[in-house]
């Protein structure tokens, strides 16, 4: 157990904090590129866990407006610059309500609960469909073995497709 505590690397400060300190320390007029930032962090804080983590944090900070990105260089965002506008159409301005009006709370989501004190509803009469037949597949009627169904009288023609008519061979005599 004691060896685990000795071998633990020193804890690093959060990436955004390291990146901001790096940009302040490098203090380049046109900003610093990703490789310069990673080299400075490695020399100052030692080995980094993963190189891709730095890139993802730089992108997050760029998207949130903490950093500005120009010509492949990162620099601290100007505090006087207006905030970046979000995507899409901005919402319409809301018209102010006249004073004294009571705003009702919005309706809750979902189906409202049933009233426990309400009288039970009378059961509905089932609507019969247009035909007198019941829904679904009809029930199988079991046949009794004693009663044999009379077979249909055959008309002399067999069931199915008739066989193909073959031409009769005629005898041809060959005289020479």
UniProtKB/Swiss-Prot annotation:
One of its GO terms (biological process) is negative regulation of DNA recombination. Keywords: DNA-binding, Nucleus, Repeat. It comes from the Eukaryota. This is HMG-Y-related protein A. Residues 143-157 have a biased composition (Low complexity). Belongs to the HMGA family. Residues 11-78 form the H15 domain.
């Amino acid at each position: 157990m004691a060896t685990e505590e000795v071998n633990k690397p020193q804890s690093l400060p959060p990436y955004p904090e390291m990146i901001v300190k790096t940009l302040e320390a490098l203090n380049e007029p046109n900003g610093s590129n990703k490789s310069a930032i990673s080299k400075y962090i490695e020399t100052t804080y030692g080995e980094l866990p993963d190189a891709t983590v730095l890139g993802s944090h730089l992108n997050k900070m760029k998207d949130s407006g903490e950093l500005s990105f120009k010509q492949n260089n990162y620099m601290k965002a100007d505090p006087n610059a207006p905030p970046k506008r979000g995507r899409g159409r901005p919402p319409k301005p809301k018209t102010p309500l006249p004073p004294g009006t009571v705003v009702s709370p919005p309706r809750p989501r979902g189906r409202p609960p049933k009233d426990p004190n309400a009288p039970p509803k009378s059961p509905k009469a089932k609507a019969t469909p247009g035909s007198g037949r019941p829904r679904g597949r009809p029930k199988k009627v079991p046949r009794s073995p004693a009663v044999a169904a009379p077979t249909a009288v055959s008309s002399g023609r067999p069931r199915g497709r008739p066989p193909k008519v073959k031409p009769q061979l005629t005898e041809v005599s060959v005289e020479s």
